[in-house]
Amino acid sequence: DLGPRAQVHGVPLLLEPLNRYETNLINTVADGLALLETLQTKNVKLLCDLFHMNIEEVSVAGALREAGGNVGHVHFADSNRRAVGFGHTDFAPIAATLASIGYSGYLSAEILPLPDSERAAAQTISSYRKFVTEG
């Protein structure tokens, strides 16, 4: 089991639920939480990818609320894997939920470089400021 070995070294492990088109193993936050409950260690957390969550969750904010302190990292992406703001996801409740569960970790952009990498990066920065730092 990697969990206890990593814990000895102070290294967290992240489990990312993926959408049903990529795997049939762990698709939702609830699936991930069920697996975490079976582990002997507490240093395994969920990597919550907002793109995958848009496909699988009834409510992205609700799933994040359910995960609570088990959120170890967030992939900040819109419904179409483009920069936040270039899809249809409503990020205000997601940002509010992350704040309400006390998440203070990183949000990384795992996005497509569309319409080009410079504009995708600029949109990501703008959206991060709008929803996370200024929220």
Kindly give the residue locations of the regions a language model identified.
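Active-site acidic/histidine proton-transfer and metal-coordination neighborhood
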Residues: 1-45
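Histidine-acidic metal/acid-base catalytic patches
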Residues: 26-48, 52-135
